[in-house]
Amino acid sequence: MRKGPAVGAIFIILLPIFASACSSEPREYDFAVSVAGGPEGWPVWVEEVIVDQSWRVPAGGIEHGFDQHPPMGGVAVLGPKPAPGEIYARWFSHRTEKFYDVALSLPEDLDDKLRKWYRDYPLEDYSHTLIVGFSGKGEALAWWKAFCSTCNYDRSHDFSTPLVENVKGEVVEGDPGRYNVRTGEHVERGTIPPPPMWLIRQSDGDAGN
């Protein structure tokens, strides 16, 4: 009979601790990720995009979308995630034949903003997308977009806003010869003028990949 109060006391003490632990779990949001490139005449090959050092976004060759408002690119649906904080990316510009990388720091209050945006643009009617863009000029950006899926063709109900813009990527080491074939395809199509070093490699018989 004497054990009853003790057990009750333990329960009362542990319950707030358990509730506190649950409340500390980060809120997750259901959104997709879109990767834009370009702009036109500045095609890129995005080698990797890593969010919060934990999950990767597929990318590859991209020619358009960087200079649109909002930017546009291929979309990857990755499932619910916490509000992103940092995006690392590395990409190659076929026109400059340079490699760039960048670590985009997203706004510290993004989680608070997402809570509001998901209330204003609920998932029942909207699909949310984190948009990241990497240009052939070595620039990077990030936007957020909510696309109304129940508004037919009326795009006036969509929402989009820049998160980070006009960020300069750092030129890093890399072998442009790895992209000889893809760069050559852009030259043949007239997408870009022949890069000087690409012409030299071609004359030296370095066909590359």
Positions of the model-derived regions?
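Bacterial N-terminal signal peptides that target proteins for export
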Residues: 1-10
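C-terminal motif of bacterial Sec signal peptides marking the signal peptidase cleavage site
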Residues: 18-21
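Tryptophan-paired
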Residues: 47-95
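Edge beta-strands of extracellular beta-sandwich domains
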Residues: 98-105
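Compositionally biased low-complexity segments at domain edges in trafficked proteins
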Residues: 114-189, 194, 208
